[in-house]
Amino acid sequence: MSTGINAINEAVKEASAFTRPLFNELGKVIIGQSYLTERLVIGLLANGHVLLEGVPGLAKTLSVKSLANCIRVKFSRLQFTPDMLPADVIGTQIYNPQSGGFSTRKGPIFANLILADEINRAPAKVQSALLEAMQEKQVTIGDQTFKLEEPFLVLATQNPIEQEGTYPLPEAQVDRFMLKLKIGYPARGEERQILDLMARTSGTPTTSAVVDPKDILKAREVINDIYIDDKVKEYIVDLVCATREPEQYKIQVKDFIQLGASPRATINLALAAKAYAFLKGRGYVTPQDVKSIGMDVLRHRVAITYEAEAEDKTSEIIIQKIFDELPVP
């Protein structure tokens, strides 16, 4: 087994060489959001979409656009509004009166990295069109089906403050996002660095292309081979099952949980932990990798009860209690 682990470690070391210049390049224009940029890259490597919650002005758009520039892929931004139609996302067929036929006009979903801004402002049929494209990695326009080009990552944002005129995502649709991130303000020192950076540059700072898309696809193949010990697999399954039946693990949170995490959470937690280990240069997953990425995988998959809300308990507080009390292998 040690020989196999050594081979995987070597493969990870070789395949992850691009991550250092990638993060260095992102660090030139994005200050104080290392958590955001690392999780974006994890989503990209694990082939999972990301739901982002944070107030405006926290470099969400800049991060995604800069990442797209760094890896030579196409970036697209969708600003969702209540009057949008599915055709505004996936495209439509246009009638040509001269030829008497229809031509296909592809929508902004045909890109590699997509920022879906304020997804909860779009009506359900538009959300459904986007989420179907995310799940199937293909789009149907008229009677034609088009495959979406890899790598393909959707970063959808929600504003936690403004809830008027919004259409909250149903649990079944939120579950399709591998990660949900909560982004906070930068530290005071980091904010001063941002001010200095803007003083030195005219306009918005930009990044250079340092990674080829083939590097991302190769990294995904290596990540699939990263080793997870049976004990760590059991730990992952226990974590997810503890959100459904906490009393089985002697964790006193059952009255606060309305709906636990689905089996998709188990799969995504394993994939995200592998991608996290890859970024750390390892060919195997540790329980700490699972704990480090676990909150981002689980926070949007655990629905809380009215009793929990009355006691100001969030899904994060409940999940953290499970992490704290569940034995680590």
Regions found by a protein language model. Give the residues of each.
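P-loop (Walker A) phosphate-binding loop of NTP-binding proteins
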Residues: 55, 89, 157
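Conserved C-terminal "switch" segment of AAA+ ATPases
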Residues: 8-16, 29, 166, 180-253, ...
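Walker A/P-loop
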Residues: 44-81
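Pre-Walker A (pre-P-loop) alpha-helix and adjacent loop at the N terminus of AAA/AAA+ ATPase modules
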Residues: 12-58
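Conserved alpha-helical scaffold flanking the Walker A/P-loop in AAA+ ATPase domains
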Residues: 39-42, 95-115
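AAA+/SF3 P-loop NTPase mechanochemical coupling elements
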Residues: 103-112, 141-158, 169-178
